[in-house]
Structure formats: structure tokens, C-alpha cells
Regions:
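Extracellular/virion structural assembly segments
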Residues: 1-158
Length: 158
């Protein structure tokens, strides 16, 4: 099946980027990187500094893609990826069992250009305020079916 990317805005509009929709993502910049800022402090009578903490910044992703020239797809991209309206960006890779999402807001609505005679390029930017992907897959663990000695191997009765 491959990779499917779906964007759903907070108003309920959605658009899918996949082989089935004939809207293709060719590159995603910023998908796997995180910007980290370190806080440092000087040490009295010491050499160098010590790390006192770090901040992991929000994630900025740039999506570039193309589609067969179609005014309906063009209009749908503009109708779903709206300025000032947040949403959920889902990334599903069935070949590698990945089903994750980010919540955020577009920082650039789609821009368009010509790719070839019958195809059109597009690009938009999305900022996820929480930089890590979250799983769409629900995991549950039943404590009713678990032997308590597996959880606490220490005898607490003494």
C-alpha cells in the first residue's frame, strides 16, 4: 500500500495525499529532525560550562508535492489548508506499520507552480507545537489478567 498522508483541519475538512487520491507528496523537509537548544551555566573556578537543561522546539515541516492538473484538487487544497485554522496531520506507512500524527497549524498555505505540461506543483508548511509524533494505534494492558507477582516480585506481606 505505501505511505498515506492525511490532513484534517479543525473545521472538519480533510485532504489525502496518496496514490489513491492522485495527489502525491514528493518531499517532506523537517519530518525527522528536532531543533534542541541547550542551557548552559558557567562554573566558578572551573573550565567550560555545565548543561543546565534543554528545550526541544516545535517542529516545522515543509511538504512539496504534485498532482495532475485539476482545478478541483487545486481548490480543495486551498479549501482545506486554511490560514489560522489548525488541524491534524496523519502519516501512515502500512509497509512499515507506522501510524502517527501531529497537531498544529499551517504556517504557509499552498503555493502552486507548473511541474510539466499536465502536472502542477504545490507546497505548504505545517508547524507542530509538540515536536514528537504521537501514535494513532491504541495500546491497552489488562491488569485483570495479570498475575500480580509479575508486576511486584517483592513479597510485601512481611
Amino acid at each position: 500500500m505505501g505511505v498515506t498522508i492525511k490532513y484534517t483541519n479543525n473545521l472538519g475538512g480533510s485532504i489525502e495525499f496518496s496514490n489513491a487520491s492522485h495527489i502525491y507528496i514528493s518531499t517532506i523537509d523537517g519530518l525527522s529532525s528536532n531543533d534542541i537548544s541547550l542551557s548552559e551555566s558557567d562554573v566558578i573556578n572551573g573550565v567550560g560550562t555545565i548543561n543546565t537543561g534543554c528545550t526541544i522546539s516545535s517542529k516545522q515541516m515543509t511538504f512539496t508535492g504534485f498532482f495532475t492538473k485539476d482545478k478541483d484538487i487545486h481548490a480543495r487544497l486551498l479549501a482545506v489548508i486554511l490560514p489560522g485554522v489548525g488541524g491534524k496531520l496523519e502519516y501512515v506507512d502500512t509497509d512499515n506499520d507506522i501510524d502517527v500524527f501531529w497537531e498544529g497549524t499551517p504556517t504557509s498555505t499552498p503555493t502552486f507552480g507548473w511541474r510539466e505540461q499536465y502536472t502542477e506543483n504545490f507546497q505548504f508548511k505545517f508547524k507542530a507545537f509538540y515536536p514528537y509524533a504521537r501514535s494513532n494505534q491504541l495500546y491497552s494492558y489488562s491488569f485483570l489478567e495479570t498475575n500480580t507477582t509479575e508486576l511486584l516480585p517483592i513479597d510485601l506481606t512481611t
